[in-house]
């Protein structure tokens, strides 16, 4: 049996001494400031002594087994103590330092969900086209960053599932565009303070997904319509495979509020206007390509109104006998749906409000970005949207339920980040 070392040479006793001195100082301050009373301090002291004594006994048991085991174990503890000392030294020299720990319990929970997601990615949905990242990718990913899709998986899925997914163009030569319209300052409504957080986070996400972002702020409904028409006419869409349209503003059931909106004189961009500008008749460069609408806005509380889409312009085309016959006999004309490949994801259900919390931005945009970063490497778009909805499933103090609407997508849309 190896002989026990003296207290002066054993790292355990040094660490116990350091811990005791530190805890004594902390407890003195807690009692002095009336944070703890005598009974509470006694209980904590007993617990601390128990931990320290058990740690000593554990090391002594190792020492009794073999001297080598004791050296290994004590060495690890000594190294930990050295790192702790170095951390405190750096803090004293350089001032407060940011320690790399999860910022909240929810962030730690997200990390656990991330790991579970990577293990069980292929079990989520029968219709889901599965991608499984290699173990190295999973273990090397940094929390709160966009997870990338492995190149070999991208090529495999793109080839084997070509008939089930929307075509994804190669990076080289691809000119994806996204539009963000954010109204922050209003003439008659409250300003949307701290909306810059949502803008920056959404812009960063879209750029990381390969989109060049066009940002427009503080527009009337007419100005928004003009910007949409100009964006729809951009030549880059011809060499693009998709687009995102993001709206962040006040809103009512009928649509997005412009900066001059008031009850007596509404200034509203209607959904039908957006869909009409980008439909297959008016925006041919995006025909058969996914068009994703993200809307962060309240949807009003008015009664007697329902959320509908009009069929203006379609009925005539379908019932005009001469036009139909002309299409049949003219080989240069093919029949096409007026509106396809759209999906709208809105921050709340009709008639209900959408919450924005201080400097952290809106709940909906925050959750949306978080789910994109976690899941778009292996899930298709609609599945990601359901992940966002699931995060709102249990009502909290701030209750809302994002809704997926006006879906005319005929295939799965994968973003394949990194490709």
Swiss-Prot record:
InterPro entries per the UniProt record, alphabetical: CARD, Caspase-like_dom_sf, Caspase_cys_AS, Caspase_his_AS, DEATH-like_dom_sf, Pept_C14, Pept_C14_caspase, Pept_C14_p10
Expression by tissue: Mainly expressed in skeletal muscle and lung.
Catalytic site positions: 250, 298
PANTHER family recorded: CASPASE RECRUITMENT DOMAIN-CONTAINING PROTEIN 18 (PTHR47901), CASPASE-12 (PTHR47901:SF6)
Modified residues (Phosphoserine): 85
A Pfam family of this chain: Peptidase_C14
Enzyme Commission numbers on file: 3.4.22.-
Record protein name field: Caspase-12
Keyword annotations of the record: Apoptosis, Hydrolase, Phosphoprotein, Protease, Thiol protease, Zymogen
A Gene Ontology term for the protein's cellular component: endoplasmic reticulum
Keyword Nuclease among record annotations: no
One example of a Gene Ontology biological process annotation: regulation of apoptotic process
Cross-referenced CDD domains: CARD_CASP1-like, CASc
Domain of life according to the entry: Eukaryota
Summary of the function given for this chain in its UniProt record: Involved in the activation cascade of caspases responsible for apoptosis execution.
GO molecular function: cysteine-type endopeptidase activity
Subunit structure: Heterotetramer that consists of two anti-parallel arranged heterodimers, each one formed by two subunits (Potential). Interacts with TRAF2 under resting conditions; this interaction is reduced in ER stress conditions.
